[in-house]
From Swiss-Prot:
Gene name for this UniProt entry: metE
Organism, as annotated: Bordetella parapertussis (strain 12822 / ATCC BAA-587 / NCTC 13253)
Entry protein name: 5-methyltetrahydropteroyltriglutamate--homocysteine methyltransferase
Record note on cofactor: Binds 1 zinc ion per subunit.
Matching Gene3D superfamilies: 3.20.20.210
Positions of L-methionine binding: I442, G443, S444, E495, D610
This enzyme's EC code(s): 2.1.1.14
């Protein structure tokens, strides 16, 4: 019998029950006990579904109220002083929420902890804050209580915890200025490891046999000091009475292979979707009795698995390892939707190509039975059905568009060049006549319940096209008038017609499909529903021109056209796996180029092409960066270079660290870049200062992920810090990101303050 297990299950619920419960608690509409009851019900349902699929150990510890790294940070008692947590007391739920979002039903608001991308995914984690001499202790009981919950329901459990070195690698602190690999962070291990030891001892006391300890940092470029630390750390942790399954994912071990194989752990999980070529070396390097967990089902995409190929890859290793070969998804299933059963509106053909979390576990079970030689006819029938679905997808005429193929064949000859920036900016200033420290927003304005109801009624047919258009026009006019009243310089139309910055465009492009309930967690309670790129991408008609032109007709101030860039659409979609991602991105760039040209022709003088995801697309290994950055930058320029020098091109990036890709950002050659900087206290600007970034830049002056309204003096101080690093004539004033998730009262107060801050700076 082949053991199958799972690294983690989506925590949000099939109907986003967790999101709704958490937000109701934040709003005071639900008690803490009701929230905890929702959590218990979700965990029970998720454990049962995994057990029903044949998972040998259900994962415990993959559930989180906001973020699993934040859960672990609070378990360790690593609460920054500004949150006022009493020394030695258990960390309560509201403290956790204040760390994640700045406020909670109880406790004083405080600046939220930094949030950034989880490796190269579209999930965000809350960054641990580290200080020299920091102390740690077991400060929350949730993990242990959830183990007992699962056991009471009759499940064998496998607790899942972040490994100490990955947790430190992800952490930041002012004293650790050398970045993730700062060796000073390793000095915290002496205080940290006893707490890990205590956790493992307590889990053993609950009857736990295996603990999954996640160390995805092992797939990164590690300094030698960190490699050495792995050996020392796991020599100590191996003394615990539980068996450790060390999990790596998102890439291969590569030059860290010897380090991983030398660790005294009972099992090792590797990602064979991202790095199938490591299988032989890993298997041959195992010690006697050591388990190999093979991550063969893609935990990050939604296509059915080629089980025949997986069987062919695994058969020799199964022969070698026998029962010591375990099967699992490549990584946690956090990154895919919960269940295809909720997709009642996808056509049968496309539905047959897909696999969500529940289906991936079923695939895993089928693969395990086939690998173990199960003689049940249902196994062969299942393999045959899988084979037929893959063949149907390969042969479907829906995938290939001859017109797109023809255009792609000639895209190399399409210009990516614009006039020099100095020439462009002079022309743009003469046309736009903007003041010093011009103010703008990033694009979206609050999406009220009324706006969401409008879109919902229109999509369901309850609202006619003309009634919907009139209602959206009214919303746009209100946003324009509001911005004029506040005194913003470059306006936006507010995007009331858009449910999501990627899904909106996907609905208007050929080659995309959409789920009804394919939600995945992005951060906190924020969920996104990524489109599915299943075929060649083309733009049948203009997508934004009508709304932008209408908004511009209402005001003499410039109104930005708002587009999502090709790399971000790619990164935030589930992308076809039958051609290189680069090819799909170029198809997107050509479609967006047509839209940019049409916006200019409609009188739009400022066009923003958002690329918040360009850094997250970076391969995890630096040796692979150049190839990616070359085509990513080329795709951006392909989408923007069709307009004249008087048209000002903006781009926006958020949740990013720029130091190591600043040259490529400059090569994108946007006239203005707006970035997230407020949570980092403008530290991200150092990259632009050191590089002598040549174009205009708008460093975000307040954090839109927090409901806290910023003080004017604080925003002025942030901009003065920016002006100390960059020429003030090239600085813009703007929020960190779009305002979609904020309420109107806090939005109005924050923007009034932001405009006042800009006026203060001009008067100085």
């Amino acid at each position: 019998m082949t053991i199958i297990h799972n690294l983690g299950f989506p925590r949000i619920g099939a109907q986003r029950e967790l999101k709704r419960a958490v937000e109701a608690y934040w709003a005071g509409r639900q008690t803490a006990e009701a929230l905890h009851e929702t959590g218990r019900a979700l965990r029970a349902a998720h454990w049962q579904r995994q057990a029903d699929a044949g998972v040998a150990f259900v994962p415990v510890g993959d559930f989180a109220w906001y973020d699993h790294i934040l859960e672990w940070t609070t378990l360790l008692g690593a609460v920054p002083a500004r949150f006022g947590h009493p020394e030695g007391k258990p960390v309560d739920l509201d403290t956790l929420f204040r760390m994640g979002r700045g406020r909670a039903p109880s406790g004083k608001p405080a600046a939220a902890c930094e949030m950034t991308k989880w490796f190269d995914t579209n999930y965000h984690y809350i960054v641990p804050e580290l200080t020299p001499g920091q102390t740690f202790r077991v400060a929350r009981e949730d993990l242990f209580e959830q183990v007992k919950e699962a056991q009471a329901l009759g499940h064998r459990v496998k607790p899942v915890i972040p490994g100490p070195l990955t947790w430190l690698w992800l952490g930041k602190g002012d004293a650790f200025a050398q970045g993730a690999g700062d060796i000073g962070k390793l000095q915290l291990l002496d205080a940290l490891l006893p707490v890990y030891g205590e956790v493992l001892e307590r889990l053993a006391g609950l009857g736990v046999e295996w603990v999954q300890i996640d160390e995805p940092a092992l797939v990164l470029d590690l300094p030698q000091a960190w490699r050495d630390a792995y050996q020392a750390v796991y020599a100590k942790l191996a003394a615990s009475p539980v068996k450790l399954l060390l999990a790596t994912y998102f890439d291969g071990l590569k030059d860290n292979l010897a380090t991983a194989l030398a660790l005294p752990v009972a099992g090792l999980h590797v990602d064979l979707v991202r790095a199938p070529d490591q299988l032989s070396d890993v298997a041959s390097g195992l010690r006697p009795g050591q388990v190999l967990s093979a991550g063969v089902i893609n935990g990050r995409n939604i296509w059915r698995t080629d089980l025949d190929a997986a069987l062919a890859m695994l058969a020799p290793v199964r022969e070698q390892l026998q029962e010591r070969l375990w099967l699992a998804p490549s990584c946690s299933l956090l990154h895919v939707p919960v269940d295809l059963a909720g997709e009642t509106e996808l056509d049968a053909e496309l539905l047959g190509w897909l696999s969500f979390a529940v289906q991936k576990l079923d695939e895993l079970c089928l693969l395990g039975k086939a690998l173990g030689g199960d003689a049940d006819p249902a196994v062969q029938q299942g393999l045959a059905a899988q084979r037929a679905a893959l063949q149907a997808r390969r042969q479907s005429p829906r995938i290939h568009n001859p017109a797109v193929a023809q255009r792609m064949a000639g895209q190399a000859g399409v210009s990516r060049e614009r006039a020099p920036f100095g020439q462009r900016i002079a022309r743009q200033q003469s046309e736009l006549r903007l003041p010093a420290f011009p103010t703008t927003t990033i694009g979206s304005f609050p999406q009220t319940a009324e706006i969401r109801a409008l879109r919902r009624d229109w999509k369901s047919g309850a609202l006619t096209d003309s009634a919907y258009e009139n209602a959206i026009r009214k919303e746009i006019e209100e946003v324009i008038r509001f911005q004029e009243k506040v005194g913003l310089d470059v306006l936006v139309h507010g995007e009331p017609e858009r449910n999501d910055m990627v899904e909106y465009f996907g609905e208007l492009l050929a080659g995309f499909a959409f789920t009804k309930n394919g939600w995945v967690q992005s951060y906190g309670s924020r969920c996104v529903k990524p489109p599915i790129i299943f075929g060649d991408v083309a733009r049948p008609a203009p997508m934004t021109v009508g709304w932008s032109a209408y908004a511009q007709s209402l005001t003499d101030k410039p109104v930005k056209g708002m587009l999502t860039g090709p790399v971000t659409i790619l990164q935030w979609s589930f992308v076809r796996d039958d051609q290189p991602r680069e090819a799909t991105c170029r198809q997107l760039a050509l479609a967006l180029r047509d839209e940019v040209v049409d916006l200019e022709a409609a009188g739009i003088r400022v066009i923003q092409i958002d690329e918040p995801a360009i850094r997250e697309g970076l391969p995890l290994r630096r040796a692979d960066w150049r190839a990616y950055l070359d085509w990513a930058v080329d795709c951006f320029r392909l989408s923007t270079a069709g307009v004249g020098e008087a048209t000002q091109i903006h781009t926006h990036m958020c949740y990013s660290e720029f130091n190591d890709i600043i040259e490529s950002i400059a090569a994108m050659d946007a006239d203005v870049i707006t970035i997230e900087t407020s949570r980092s206290n403008m530290e991200l600007l150092k990259a632009f200062e050191d590089f002598h970034y040549p174009n205009d830049i708008g460093p975000g002056v307040y954090d839109i992920h927090s409901p806290n309204v910023p003080e004017v003096d604080w925003m002025v101080e942030l901009m003065r810090k920016a002006a100390a690093r960059l020429p003030k004539e090239r600085l813009w004033v703007n929020p960190d990101c779009g305002l979609k998730t904020r309420a109107w009262p806090e939005t109005e107060a924050a923007l009034i303050g932001m405009v006042q801050a800009a006026r203060t700076l001009r008067a100085a």
